[in-house]
């Protein structure tokens, strides 16, 4: 049972005391969202992946309710033990198109970290997504300075160099209205 909850932080060291404090609070908050049920770990009904996003980048309250319900149902119905949760702090240096498991970059727009949940059966799950990805053994990282072109189907078509992350937000919003 000692290995049931293994929390790991990967990436850069906190830049200052304020960032260190926020990371500590975040990990405590994440742990509180996992509650053991009959020797298994399930997400509390109050769990909302949007809470993992910085406040100024968080979607409006109520946004993505359907995706949230699918996400929680998918995880809780798996009835597997959560063996670890790895928090990878997002840094410049890795491309949106290099995400493990073919993840949709739209799931991570605005996030400052990626949380990887590892279950007994092996899938990796991204917060805010109802998709389950098979493990690849790679860390999930994202480069906020490497914008990509995403078509109306959410597929990466090519990279746009020199565009701001705000422009990527705008492009995704345009695609959502098509």
Where are the language model's segments positioned?
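C-terminal and inter-domain tail/linker signature
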Residues: 1-178
């Amino acid at each position: 049972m000692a290995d049931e909850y293994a929390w790991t932080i990967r990436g850069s060291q906190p830049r200052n005391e304020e960032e260190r404090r926020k990371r500590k609070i975040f990990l405590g908050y994440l742990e509180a969202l996992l509650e053991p049920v009959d020797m298994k770990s399930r997400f509390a009904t109050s769990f909302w992946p949007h809470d993992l996003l910085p406040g100024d980048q968080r979607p409006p309250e109520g946004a993505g309710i359907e995706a949230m319900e699918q996400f929680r149902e998918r995880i809780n119905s798996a009835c597997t033990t959560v063996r670890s949760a790895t928090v990878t702090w997002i840094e410049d240096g890795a491309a949106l198109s290099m995400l493990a498991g073919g993840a949709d970059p739209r799931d991570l727009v605005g996030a400052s970290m990626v949380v990887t949940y590892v279950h007994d059966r092996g899938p990796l799950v991204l917060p805010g997504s109802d998709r389950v990805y098979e493990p690849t053994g790679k860390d999930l990282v994202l480069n906020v300075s490497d914008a990509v072109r995403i078509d109306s189907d959410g597929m990466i078509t090519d990279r746009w160099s020199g565009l701001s992350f705000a422009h990527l937000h705008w492009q995704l919003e345009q695609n959502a209205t098509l």
